[in-house]
């Protein structure tokens, strides 16, 4: 990049003389945060395995038994029902978001598998999946897919601030 303004030696000397008595101010009003570290590179083999897992866990033929009355919800057997209540109340804040608007079922299935794998990799316990309303294809299919995945502990229709009836909050099981 070229400098736009060229100072002559006389102008530079004049500038130095004009600021000679100035003291440096201590900046104490703005907290500077260090930028987040970039994640490690993910091995191509691991990405391929995550894609294979996504197609393995999500079947279009299998129909898990979900409650049809009230909001969409699911809790894996052996998990406390209080977890679903905490999701409903908004006690968990989603750290990752997935928007499925405009995707086909195949694309949505892959993205959902990638989200769950990313949550496990990044140690994210709660995520939000926005399936939208549309023609209700993804709205009906998304809970069926999520109930099949072994790493999903529970999910519930999201509170209004995170999408309401057009989104689901899900809890992911993390390794200790």
Curated annotation (Swiss-Prot):
Q: For this protein, what is the EC number?
A: 3.1.-.-
Q: Where is the Smr domain?
A: 98-173
What keywords are annotated for this sequence in UniProt? Endonuclease, Hydrolase, Nuclease, RNA-binding, rRNA-binding
What GO terms in the biological process aspect are recorded for it? Answer: rescue of stalled ribosome
Query: Top enzyme class of this protein?
Result: hydrolase
**Family matches, as InterPro entries:** Smr_dom (IPR002625), Smr_dom_sf (IPR036063), SmrB-like (IPR022990)
Q: Which GO terms describe its molecular function?
A: RNA endonuclease activity; rRNA binding
**Cited function:** Acts as a ribosome collision sensor. Detects stalled/collided disomes (pairs of ribosomes where the leading ribosome is stalled and a second ribosome has collided with it) and endonucleolytically cleaves mRNA at the 5' boundary of the stalled ribosome. Stalled/collided disomes form a new interface (primarily via the 30S subunits) that binds SmrB. Cleaved mRNA becomes available for tmRNA ligation, leading to ribosomal subunit dissociation and rescue of stalled ribosomes.
Tell me its family.
Belongs to the SmrB family.
Provide the assembly information. Answer: Associates with collided ribosomes, but not with correctly translating polysomes.
Q: Which PANTHER family match?
A: DNA ENDONUCLEASE SMRA-RELATED, UPF0115 PROTEIN YFCN
Q: What is this protein called?
A: Ribosome rescue factor SmrB
- The organism encoding this protein is Yersinia pestis
Q: What is the lineage of its organism?
A: Bacteria, Pseudomonadati, Pseudomonadota, Gammaproteobacteria, Enterobacterales
Q: Which gene encodes it?
A: smrB
